[in-house]
UniProtKB/Swiss-Prot annotation:
Assigned protein family: Belongs to the peptidase M28 family. M28E subfamily.
Domain of life: Eukaryota
Residue ranges of the propeptide: 20-88
Designated name of the protein: Leucine aminopeptidase 1
UniProt cofactor(s): Zn(2+)
Pfam families documented for this protein: Peptidase_M28
Note on how the cofactor is bound: Binds 2 Zn(2+) ions per subunit.
Residues making up the signal peptide according to the UniProt record: 1-19
Documented EC number(s): 3.4.11.-
Gene field: LAP1
């Protein structure tokens, strides 16, 4: 997710080990000259783009600079303003406390811990690595297992791979509703060690193993609702696990670009990226809370998220900002879809060990992750039955 500020990258970073795929639609004159480092077009703000090498991408992330990599986007020159923003009215109150009460009791910290320990055992989940494919395959199997164990497969609940030109695929699980109006919950499955991405370990426990297993647990429990799994909800629910977030939101961009082109009716998207670290907050003497992002998000959906947290979590929220293109919700916003993002704490108190070998499970709070799981489950259920 966010970038970690570290020093002296230039002195230690080697040339990139693997060249990224160049989109076939890039004009010949814009392709890199043979023998020179491959260049990528990144977008650092609504109207700001730049050509960089892969090593320069990682240097920017180390300096705390986030971006879209739009090299492979056919309409890469478009401004975010060119996609008309979808206007959605979200509920003014939460209404399903009775139905959600028994479901919330089924959320399991042990499940999240067990899944996260295994997920972080892969050497790296770097999007162009062999172990990145292996970790995605394992995650896909866990989603499949949740569907089979709940009996939801007989009601057309399904999980699919969304393939990319790099190795690691994204994952989309769909719970059909009575309409094609769709609510998306997302997290990114890849990890990165910014010092040597293709070589060094990248456990990525918090970034974003925590979000990955948080929404997996919410998905598992949501399928215990007969009304949901049998398709009686008003709206379709999708759970996404994105590839290649760390490389410039590549996986989520590809998905929401496809949704835009095919006319998908996406009513809301919630991102869960980094859900487990509280040490920064508690050491500062502050109250444990979740961080509601307020910049580059949909205001109406963000107000609804506040209602969900107040209604279903046992800790408060704080308002905070993370900047442009700081996680995959930005891809939904880029294509006009309402998006929101909730992180583990106020942004300045979030985990500073990400993108290194130090992003490990032992530093995380599963009690805190349970709060994010409660919020995610309640968000999905409330909007599944809402008139949007």
């Amino acid at each position: 997710m966010k970038s970690l500020s570290l020093l002296a990258l230039a002195a230690i970073a080697p040339p990139a080990a693997v060249a990224a795929v160049v989109d076939r639609q890039v004009p010949f004159e814009n392709r890199p000259v043979q023998g020179l480092p491959e260049k990528f077009l990144i977008q650092l703000g609504p109207e700001q783009t730049r050509w960089v090498t892969e090593d320069e991408k990682w240097a920017l992330k180390m300096e705390g600079v986030n971006f879209f990599d739009i090299t492979a986007e056919p309409d890469r020159g478009f401004s975010a303003k060119s996609h008309e923003r979808i206007q959605v009215s979200f509920p003014s109150e939460v209404k399903h406390q009775t139905e959600l009460a028994p479901l919330l009791e089924q959320l399991s910290k042990d499940n999240m811990r067990q899944n996260l320990v295994h997920f972080t055992s892969f050497h790296t989940r770097y999007y162009k690595s062999e172990t990145g494919v292996q970790s995605a395959t394992w995650l896909f199997e866990q989603v499949e297992e949740a569907i089979q164990d709940s009996g939801a497969a007989q009601h057309a609940v399904k999980v699919e791979r969304f393939e990319h030109s790099w190795g690691q695929f994204s994952i989309i699980a769909t719970i059909p509703g009575r309409t094609n109006k769709t609510v998306v919950i997302g997290a990114h499955q890849d990890s990165i060690n910014l010092f040597l991405p293709s070589i060094l370990p990248a456990p990525g426990a918090d970034d974003d193993g925590s979000g990955t297993v948080t929404i997996l647990e919410a998905f598992r429990v949501l399928l215990q609702s007969e009304a949901v799994q049998q398709g009686n909800a008003a709206n379709t629910i999708e759970f996404h696990w994105y590839s290649a977030e760390e490389a410039g939101l590549l996986g989520s961009q590809a998905i929401f670009s496809d949704y835009s082109k095919t006319g998908r009716d996406i009513k809301a998207m919630l991102q869960q990226d980094m859900t487990g670290y509280v040490e920064g907050t508690t050491k500062a003497g502050e109250v444990e809370s979740v961080g509601v992002i307020t910049d580059f998000v949909d205001p109406g959906l963000t107000e609804f998220i506040k209602r969900v947290i107040t209604g279903y979590c046992t800790i408060p929220f704080v308002l905070t900002q993370c900047g442009y293109a700081c996680s995959d919700h930005a891809s939904a916003s880029r294509y006009g879809y309402p998006s929101a993002f909730v992180i583990e704490s106020e942004f300045k108190r979030s985990n500073q060990r990400i993108h290194t070998t130090g992003d490990t499970v032992d530093l995380l709070s599963f009690d805190h992750m349970l709060q994010h799981a409660r919020m995610t489950l309640a968000f999905a259920y409330e909007l599944a039955f809402a008139e949007l």
